[in-house]
A protein has these predicted regions:
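Phosphate-binding loop of NTP-binding sites
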Residues: 89-241, 249-255, 309, 371-372
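Short internal beta-strands
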Residues: 63-69, 239-243, 379-380, 404-410
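Well-ordered beta-strand positions
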Residues: 39, 64, 196, 238, ...
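Short secondary-structure boundary segments
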Residues: 67-70, 179, 201, 243, ...
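Active-site regions of enzymes building and remodeling cell-envelope glycoconjugates
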Residues: 75-83, 148-151, 256-261
Length: 494
């Protein structure tokens, strides 16, 4: 709870009409979430203008409104006018919640792929040390052991600050957070002071939003510039960077904080080598500070070796010993929808994975090739209203690695699913090897059933793109759809 006058002080050149001595009990930009004592922030969005809902907010109990254009208010509530309500929101909302990030250790993980698994590994290690940990990411929000649903990888400013405040109230000491390029570019994490920044990798994605790869890289680098800023509230900053990635050196240049680089090529300060993998596990040696440690994991894939190194680096910066990290990792289990094995007693492997980028798809296919002697059967599609340039690239990758490829729908959203499939098919035809078979089955359920029905002993069926998601977004509705459920149902029919 704060007085409006305290919030107004954070704004640039506000024009105030009304009483600023009122108490503010909540802040929101969603008129549907307004309650008595709220400050309503009117945002002019791409499809909806919050200024049209000012009076609805007042009727619901708002005692003040923040606007950027003239409005007729049917009440004597305080009206604060600024040039840009979105920019104002980024400064006043963290202030309202008393900058909760300053009361926790904040670990931000950014990169195209690997964010979710890395954040969960970090959480697992921290929890093993007795810390109460919060997680914000693609799969869910976690406060201690309680899970809550999430709609964006990184929530908007209001939701994020509310979540962080709740974490502090519930005694969370460490928050591990996936930080998306959208959030960094749009300022959603303004007011969050990170202690450790982790870079996993950078490959093609989100070019529909960022337009160029340089813009995409620049957005990611904002996190590392932030941990380098002088005169921050908290001390003990650090960065963990994948130096094997083509852009790792560029990220290194963006921070002056202490850095741990990681590698499997031997070029990092933290290195993995002698990697041995099975379909369900991996074992390798990690070298750090002149010592070697044998790491045994219940996860597989070279990409997970990288994820583990990122998590190790972050926890080393948190002061946890390599011995304690190693001990905790032995009990880590795979994250839902991340190379998740579906087992119903069948004589072949079925894996569900979230891979929805060219690099992500190639990673899981390379893993399948390394651990499976027989055929690789791929079921995948590409999302609508997203970066269309990656569709033929992913099609080509699927055809280059897969022995049988089923091109299907993902989340078509407002686009025609048939056209999306055609875009993917261009790449599939380009990458076809001799003996490779591909088929278009637009209905995702049918594609999964077909792939499983035609699998032979020793094959591996990779169902890629949706992972943990339990929905499918169509043009006019969102339906329940879970690749794992569909795979199990199909397996029970064979």
């Amino acid at each position: 709870m704060k007085h409006l006058q305290d919030i107004v002080k954070t704004l640039h050149a506000p024009h105030v009409e009304g009483n600023t001595a009122v108490e503010i009990l909540d802040v929101t930009a969603d008129s549907r979430a307004v309650k008595a004592g709220s400050l309503f922030i009117a945002l002019d969005g791409a499809t909806v203008d919050g200024h049209d809902y000012v009076n609805k907010a007042v009727e619901a109990g708002a005692v003040a409104v923040l606007v950027s254009k003239p409005v007729e208010v049917n009440s004597d509530v305080c009206v604060i006018t600024v040039e840009d309500t979105r920019a104002a929101m980024m400064s006043c909302v963290p202030n309202f919640f008393d900058y909760p990030a300053n009361s926790m250790r904040m670990i931000g993980v950014t990169g195209t792929n690997g964010k979710t698994t890395t954040t969960h590994m970090i959480r697992h290690i921290l929890k093993a040390q007795g810390h109460k940990v919060g997680v914000i990411g693609t799969v869910h929000i976690m406060i201690g052991d309680t899970s809550y649903p999430i709609h964006n990888t990184t929530p908007d400013v209001v939701d994020l600050q509310h979540i962080l405040h709740q974490m502090v109230e519930e005694g969370v000491t460490h928050c591990v957070m996936e930080v998306s390029s959208h959030a960094l570019a749009l300022g959603r994490v303004t007011g969050v002071e990170y202690d450790t920044a982790v870079f996993t990798n950078l490959t093609q994605d989100h070019l529909d939003f960022h337009k160029t790869f340089e813009n995409y890289l620049a957005a990611k680098c904002k996190l590392f510039e932030q941990v380098s800023k002088p005169n921050q509230v908290k001390s003990g900053k650090g960065a963990v960077i994948n130096i094997d990635d083509a852009y790792g050196h560029r990220v290194v240049e963006k921070t002056t904080a202490p850095i741990i680089t990681y590698s499997i090529d031997g070029s990092g300060t933290l290195n993995a080598h002698d990697v041995d993998m099975t379909p369900k596990s991996s074992r390798y040696t990690v070298s750090y500070d002149g010592h070697d440690y044998t790491v045994a994991m219940n996860t597989t894939g070279l990409f997970n070796v990288y994820n583990t190194l990122a998590a190790i680096g972050a926890c080393l910066l948190e002061g946890i010993s390599m011995e304690d990290i190693d001990k905790a990792l032995k009990t880590f289990s795979a994250v839902p929808g991340r190379f998740e094995l579906i087992e119903e007693g069948q004589p072949f492997a079925v894996v569900v994975d979230y891979a929805h980028t060219p690099d992500g798809l190639e990673n899981i296919l390379q893993t399948a090739k390394a651990i499976q002697a027989n055929r690789i059967i791929v079921v995948f599609g590409c999302g609508g209203d997203r970066d269309a340039t990656k569709r033929p690239i992913m099609g080509r990758i699927a055809a280059q690695y897969g022995d049988v490829v089923y091109v299907t729908s993902d989340n078509p959203r407002t686009e025609d699913p048939v056209q999306i499939v055609k875009d993917v098919e261009v790449g599939v035809k380009d990458g076809l090897r001799e003996g490779t078979h591909y088929e278009v089955i637009v209905d995702r359920r049918e594609a999964i059933q077909h792939a499983i029905q035609h699998a032979k002993p020793g094959d591996i069926v990779l169902i890629a793109g949706k992972g943990h998601e339990d929905y499918q977004i169509l043009k006019d509705k969102t339906i329940h759809f879970d690749d794992r459920e569909e795979a199990r149902a199909a397996l029970k029919e064979i």
